[in-house]
């Protein structure tokens, strides 16, 4: 999208917001941002604030090793697998809602095989780590009416 199209769409969006916004005696933060609220909800707007967070972290590892010396001679095999998963969800409502969620996962694997009689060897390793973090906050700040005349 070039700059001209962006500016045109921005102007159209602002004009639509101005045309559709209703006048409210006490202007709330939400109204200043472009949404319109009925006059009856201005005093209890703090109850509508909320914050939500979701985090997921998953890990998987698989290791396999194999060594054979045939016909019908020595053979070796080794296998390793692992999986970890963490999921967190936090939803908070209220005046000072805070959200914090953390998640971490780790999986390690190691496999080894060895054969004698003319030698055969195999080795496999695997390591996985995963992390996730979510933060959030919601608070309606009090208006400062100092020095203002009604």
UniProtKB/Swiss-Prot annotation:
Organism superkingdom: Eukaryota
Lineage: Eukaryota, Viridiplantae, Streptophyta, Embryophyta, Tracheophyta
Family designation: Belongs to the UPF0540 family.
Biased composition (Low complexity): 57-67, 119-135
GO cellular component, one term: apoplast
Keywords on record: Signal
Region (Disordered) location: 57-82, 119-150
This protein's record includes keyword Kinase: no
Protein name: UPF0540 protein At1g62060
Signal peptide bounds: 1-21
Swiss-Prot/TrEMBL GO biological process terms: mucilage biosynthetic process; seed coat development
């Amino acid at each position: 999208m070039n700059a001209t199209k962006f500016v045109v769409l921005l102007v159209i969006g602002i004009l639509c917001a101005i045309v559709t916004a209703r006048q409210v005696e006490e202007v709330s933060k939400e109204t200043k941002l472009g949404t319109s609220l009925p006059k009856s909800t201005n005093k209890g707007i703090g109850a509508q604030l909320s914050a939500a967070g979701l985090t997921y972290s998953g890990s998987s590892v698989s290791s396999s090793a194999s060594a054979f010396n045939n016909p019908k001679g020595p053979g070796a095999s080794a296998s390793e697998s692992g999986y970890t998963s963490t999921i967190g969800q936090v939803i908070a409502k209220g005046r000072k809602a805070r959200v914090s969620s953390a998640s971490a996962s780790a999986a390690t694997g190691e496999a080894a095989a060895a054969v004698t009689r003319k030698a055969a060897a195999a080795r496999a390793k695997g390591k996985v780590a995963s992390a996730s973090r979510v933060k959030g906050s919601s608070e309606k700040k009090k208006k400062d009416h100092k020095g203002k005349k009604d």
